[in-house]
């Protein structure tokens, strides 16, 4: 009996103070010539600060390089475009984060060397949202000055904020280490040369469950390691703008990790806000309970919930009661322990 197709569904909450994690350029509303605003967006008349999905992915990629030891695919610049090496066999980040590259491939025909243009595309198995404040936030504009030189000081301003921020991600386990080489736009993940190299190095061919062709799949141990590394990197992820003077901790302070047999992400509303201006972030325990009940047929294995002591301590009792009620479905642990135990469960599901 074949295993179910597994999608990792993750939900995180960050807790940051006096930061400016992702800026949006010059603040045209400021009285200062040198003023920078932070990224924010309006919903229902309220302002919410956010970090772009691209920035979060950049931090994630760097964590995999610096803390896990991945060798990242080199970035190649050609006039007004940039692309990675597009070699998911050698570089695990090309596999996990995807790529698109227009390339030329040499081949022999009747003893003569010829070249042909190919474009390889890899849709990322790892999808993620932006990181956005759970509650409405009004950034504060603070000014500083460069005053070490002779003469007048040079003032500049920046926006800062404190917020609880939420983010979602999804990792398609079956896609990791699995590549198609169909000669169709968007479906050619690897060149014929890389396909042959993969087979020679131990990759296998498997039937495409959604097509009539064959897919190339890397050995299980390689796929397991890439998937585990991607999740374990969350324990030490770091990044953000203005870190010299406004350093912030962007590791999760609350996390939910679940294996599911669908691509739907059900945890999007387990945190919400209240107050006259929606200024207070809260954990929606009823919403979490509702998700556990309504999607119980879609979960594969246990759902792991992690919380850092000192963050949302007032929900500890309710979360423990929830774990007792759903003891066959939930494990409630500290953050890193939850990530570690979920990763071990996931290895057996691949």
What are these model-derived regions, one by one?
Residues 1-350:
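RNA-binding basic/glycine-rich loop and surface signature characteristic of RAMP-family CRISPR effectors
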């Amino acid at each position: 009996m074949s295993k179910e197709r597994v999608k990792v569904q993750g939900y995180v909450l960050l807790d940051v103070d006096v930061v400016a994690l992702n800026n949006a350029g010059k603040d045209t509303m400021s009285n200062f010539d040198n003023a920078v605003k932070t990224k924010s967006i309006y919903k229902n008349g309220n302002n919410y600060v956010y970090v772009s999905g691209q920035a979060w992915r950049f931090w994630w990629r760097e964590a995999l390089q610096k803390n896990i030891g991945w060798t990242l695919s080199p970035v190649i610049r050609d006039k007004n475009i940039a692309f990675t090496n597009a070699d998911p066999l050698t570089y695990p980040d090309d596999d996990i984060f995807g790529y698109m590259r227009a390339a030329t491939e040499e081949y022999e025909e009747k003893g003569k060397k010829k070249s042909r243009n190919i474009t390889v595309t890899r849709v990322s198995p790892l999808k993620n949202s932006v990181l956005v404040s759970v509650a409405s936030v009004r950034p504060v504009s603070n000014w500083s000055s460069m005053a070490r030189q002779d003469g007048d000081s040079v003032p500049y301003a920046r926006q800062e904020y404190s917020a609880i921020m939420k983010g979602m991600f999804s990792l398609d386990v079956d896609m990791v280490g699995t590549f198609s080489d169909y000669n169709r736009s968007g479906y050619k993940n690897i060149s014929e040369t890389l396909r042959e190299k993969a087979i020679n190095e131990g990759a296998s061919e498997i039937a495409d469950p959604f097509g009539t062709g064959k897919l190339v799949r890397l050995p299980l141990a390689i796929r397991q390691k890439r998937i585990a590394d991607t999740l374990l990197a969350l324990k030490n992820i770091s990044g953000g703008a203005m870190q010299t003077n406004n350093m912030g901790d962007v590791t999760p302070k609350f996390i939910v990790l679940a294996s599911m047999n669908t691509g739907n992400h059900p945890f999007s509303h387990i945190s919400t806000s209240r107050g006259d201006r929606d200024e207070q972030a809260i954990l929606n325990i009823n919403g979490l309970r509702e998700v556990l009940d309504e999607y119980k047929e879609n979960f594969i294995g246990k759902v792991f919930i992690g919380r850092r002591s000192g963050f949302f301590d007032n929900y500890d009792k309710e979360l423990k009661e929830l774990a007792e009620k759903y003891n066959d479905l939930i494990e409630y642990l500290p953050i890193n322990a939850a990530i570690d135990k979920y990763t071990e469960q996931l290895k057996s599901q691949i």
